[in-house]
Amino acid sequence: MKKVTIFPVIIYMFFLLWELDAQSEYPEAMVGISHAYYTSFDSDNPFATKEMLDHIRREKFDLVLPLVMREHKIDMWIHVIRPWTWSGNEFRKLEHMNLNYRSIDSSDPLRYEFGSNAAVIVFTDQGGDRIERVVFEGEVNDPGAFDIVRRQSPFINQENYEIMDYVKENPYKVPASEMGYRFMGLGKFVLERDPKRIGVNYAETLSFAEGSETYTLALTDGISYADHLHLSKALGDKYARRMVSAEHLILDYLTRSVLGEIVLFGGSGRGSEEGRIQQFDPIVPGVTTLMDVEGGWYCTREWDHDEEAFSSVPLRRGDMFQSGQIPYYILKDGEVKPPQEVLRIWDEVVKVRKIISRNVRVGDTGREALKQIIDKLEGEGMAYIDRDRYDVTLDPKKTQVHLDLHQVGKGVLAPRISPMGPRWHSDKKIPLLLTLGVEYMVHMPVPKWGKGKHIYYCSLHERGVVTERGVEFALPPVSGIQSIR
């Protein structure tokens, strides 16, 4: 097997340059959609062109927007993307990797879907098949997706000279706070449309920050208390009393996918299995460590395995480790393939994968799907564990399985088929075309090795899509264990 060594500093520089090159080759619909935040819209995804992303946005406006607004009986949806949540000029150190996220200007849940980092966007259901789409204040990347786009107020930035002139010329029109400039004229706009129920992006029961796909870029819960006060004043008492939380509407909009998104979801992975298999420099047993080969974790384990303690432990013949989705076994002298007890783990993995794919159904809640999968696992002689940790007290002949399937690619983890997370994650019903991270962990005991010794495999976010047939894969799943000679 051909092997290559790359030292950590070179690796970092390579991926930095690769990211910059990919961004120039595949321009995004909005700067700053990173693989750390929106996994379906990676800058390295060859399908994620601006034209494709704009097409998806318009398709969702046509198909998903009327559906979710009417399901929630919302006549008008006012979504305020606050311009002060993130600064485009700040350098942030995330995960101790010295990553520069200065292009990420907003953590609003719908910043991609609406194509804006700062705006007041209003959708009105006036009957018919189409929802009126208005950018009342702010800027968007795709103005053609909207019916009306009013220019951004020059008074959002308090450092502009125009604000000084405006205050002098209109002393009685100046709002009490600069936050009020965004809503000037909105009361008249709403009055002309006379909505009965107005959905606004503030939270009452859900925490989008808690439900975020990555904690380093947690989604916001919506407008602030001050925003609510200024918006209420702009609408007047009559329409302010008609405001309700749009939190469930937002969640439904995020979880409903159109076909174009499924194309991107598959295209944003690593491609074929051959393309995902690592090529390693010759491993020297007793010298080369897991860190040297950029491995993720050891698969051959004691019952009380501590992965952090093993990162610098030299690899030995007969060890199995995982890098990305792929498991690797280091052959012992004289072996031409892994022994049967090692190969058996893959039979168990495939069995778990099939049970999952056949028992996630459109319309079930995450909790219902979890129970269904657990029942099937136990029916196949496996043991379910509610945390990713080998349980030495269970039957030593039973393979133990932990589950944490959840939505990926939209920034939020719900719906979630897992014992983890807030309750609303698993209360959420599973919609058609849900983009699902198929994440499960298999701990298979090997009694002949000794008590508690086992083989571990983690399916980390295999890309699944929920259809009428169950879970289907947007990318071919891993097919087996790779041998290292």
Where are these regions (language model features)?
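Sec/Tat signal peptide C-region and signal peptidase I cleavage site
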Residues: 18-22
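Active-site neighborhoods and metal-handling regions in enzymes and metal-associated proteins
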Residues: 23-485
